[in-house]
């Protein structure tokens, strides 16, 4: 095999190993820091404001934009609130919802600095996680067979399948196809689309049930309402903020 072929095998093997480790980490440890989608994809999911309203410019490509300070009044931080329940958010890492979690965490901390907040990956059902991991190893094995020109079927007296002959004759295109299709199937298996919010032991929002992520104002109103139910709402606190009309 030429040096170029060895180099390509090494690159694809390394990419496959990274993909396997990423999937295992997301399902076993329930904490990931990958898969941040582009800003436009996030705005299509979370941007529920009209086009006529002004927004600030993001400092990073994956930044979730919020209203300008001149048209949005943030609430006063409630520093004296004690013994607050833990806010837990379980989100789909592979869907790119990590940035949504970070943004909503900021909103909650601005009003309730003493509120403990936790976030974790919302894992798919167990059988889907196992199938996705198995597909990662199968994909890696197929890439090695194709790039190495190996025919394992001969050892079992099964000859030389036509599809394998075609793959050996078109190694680069075949490997690209296997890699992309494998990733597509894996992502479809581990993607849950979840953004589930719990305050204490009570669930206050479910994207799986509602089909959408709450707006920042809804998010804070849900927290305020649940704190009131628990008898932990501070007295005379303002809501998340008010949108002011600009002339």
Swiss-Prot record:
Disrupted-gene phenotype: Viable with normal development, anatomy, motility, lifespan and brood size. Increased sensitivity to oxidative stress induced by rotenone and impaired avoidance behavior in response to the odorants 2-nonanone and 1-octanol and the pathogenic bacterium S.marcescens. Double knockouts with selt-1.2 are also viable with no visible phenotype.
A Pfam cross-reference name: Rdx
Cellular component aspect of the GO annotation: endoplasmic reticulum membrane
Span of the signal peptide: 1-26
Keyword Signal: yes
Annotated localization: Endoplasmic reticulum
Residue ranges of coiled coil: none
Molecular function via GO: thioredoxin-disulfide reductase (NADPH) activity
Tissues with expression: Broadly expressed in neurons of nervous system including ADL, ASH, ASI, ASJ, ASK and AWB amphid sensilla neurons, in epithelial cells including hypodermal, arcade, pharyngeal, vulval and rectal cells, and in somatic muscle cells of the head, neck and body wall, and non-striated pharyngeal muscles.
Top-level taxon of origin: Eukaryota
Biological processes per GO annotation: cell redox homeostasis
Keyword flag Signal: yes
InterPro entries: Selenoprotein_Rdx-typ, Selenoprotein_T, Thioredoxin-like_sf
Entry EC no(s): 1.8.1.9
Keywords in alphabetical order: Disulfide bond, Endoplasmic reticulum, NADP, Oxidoreductase, Redox-active center, Signal
Disulfide bond entries: 92-95
Reaction equations catalysed: [thioredoxin]-dithiol + NADP(+) = [thioredoxin]-disulfide + NADPH + H(+)
Family that this chain belongs to: Belongs to the SelWTH family. SELT subfamily.
NCBIfam families, per the entry: CXXU_selWTH
Function description: Probably has thioredoxin reductase-like oxidoreductase activity. Plays a role in regulating the oxidative stress response, and odorant and pathogenic bacteria avoidance behavior.
Record protein name field: Thioredoxin reductase-like selenoprotein T homolog selt-1.1
Name of the gene: selt-1.1
